[in-house]
Amino acid sequence: MPAVQRAFAGFTNSLEESAFPAFENRSNLRYTPEDELHDLICVGFGPASLAIAVAIHDALDGTDPSLAEIPGLESRTPKVAFLEKQPQFAWHAGMLLPGAKMQITFMKDMATMRNPRSEFTFINYLHQKNRLVEFANLNTFLPARVEYEDYMRWCASWFEEVVSYSQEVIAVNPQKSANGEISVFEVVSKNLLTGQVETRRTKNVVIAAGGKPNITAPFPQNHPKVVHSSKFSYISKQILKDHQAPYKVAVVGNGQSAAEIFDFLHANYPNSQTRLLIKGGALRPSDDSPLYALHLLLPSSDYGLHSAVSMKSSTHRVPR
C-alpha cells in the first residue's frame, strides 16, 4: 500500500493536526480527502509536477515574491493532489548509467532560477546531505545524473502527504455547470495495487504524464533483445552479463541517450562490436547557448505554471 494510503487509512475530517503521522520533511501542502473538491490535481509526479509542488510550497512559505500575489493563496492552503502511476518517485531510472552527467547546470534546478531562497535548491540539498564541500571541490556545474536523481527524490519526499503513488489515471472528464461552462473536472484513477477505482473532483488539472517509450517499425515490439533506452540499465544486466563476451550490439538514434549508451558499451564491453546507427551524417551537440537558455527562462514560459496555481478552472499539458 502506498505511503499516503498507509498514513491516512481511516482518515476522517475530525482528526486533529497532531494526529497526523510525522514526515521527516514536510511541505506546506496538506492531504485532501478524495471526496472533497480539489483546487488542483496533477496527473503524473515527475519533474514538471514536482516543480509545481515546489512553487506552491514557496508561495505559501512567503519566500518567493514572484508568486506572492497569486489569487487564493493568501487566504488558505490550496487543496492539491498528485497522482503517479509508478510505485515511487523515479526519474529516467533506466538511464542512470555510471559516470553519466547532467547536460545543464545545477542552477536550473527545482527552484534556484525562480527563488534562490527556497529550501528546494540543489545547493540546500547538498548541504542537507553533507555533500556541499565535496561537490564544490569537483569544480563543476554539472552533477552526476545519479546524484541529481537523488536530489529530485529528496524534493519529492517532502510531498508524500499529497502524492498518491501506484495510481493510474484512466479518465479526466469535464463537468459542466448549469450555464454550460466547464466548472470542474472528474479525475478517475485505478489503484494498481488493489485494483480499486477512485474518483476525485478538481477545479484544475495539469497533465504531466510524460512520454511513452516507442520502438518504431521495423523493429518488433516485444523481442527480448530489442531494448528501449528507458529500460537499458535494467535489461542490459540480463542480456549482456559477460563483459568480455564478443557481443554484437547496434544502438539506433542520435540523441543524448543513444550517445551515452554507445559510450557505456564501448567502455564496459571491450570485445563487443558496437555500432551507432544514426540518420544524419554526424552527431549534433545540444543547443546550450546563452540565447537558447534565455528563451527557456522568459516569463512567458511560466504561463502553464502560473495558470495552474491561480485557481482558474483549466487544464494544462506540460512536458516532463
Residues of each region from the PLM?
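Glycine-rich dinucleotide-binding loop and its adjacent helix/turn
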Residues: 12-28, 198, 204-274
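N-terminal Rossmann-like FAD-binding beta1-loop-alpha1 element of flavoenzymes
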Residues: 31-81, 249-271
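Dinucleotide-binding/catalytic capping subdomain of oxidoreductase cores
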Residues: 64-69, 76-77, 90, 95-96, ...
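Flavin (FAD/FMN) cofactor-binding and adjacent substrate-gating region
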Residues: 101-134
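Helix-loop-beta segment of a Rossmann-like dinucleotide-binding subdomain
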Residues: 129-143, 184-188, 246-248
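Short beta-strand to alpha-helix junction loop
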Residues: 134-154, 164, 313-320
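A conserved short coil-to-beta-strand element within the FAD-binding core of flavoproteins
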Residues: 165-185
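Conserved SAM/SAH-binding loop
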Residues: 166-170, 192, 231-232
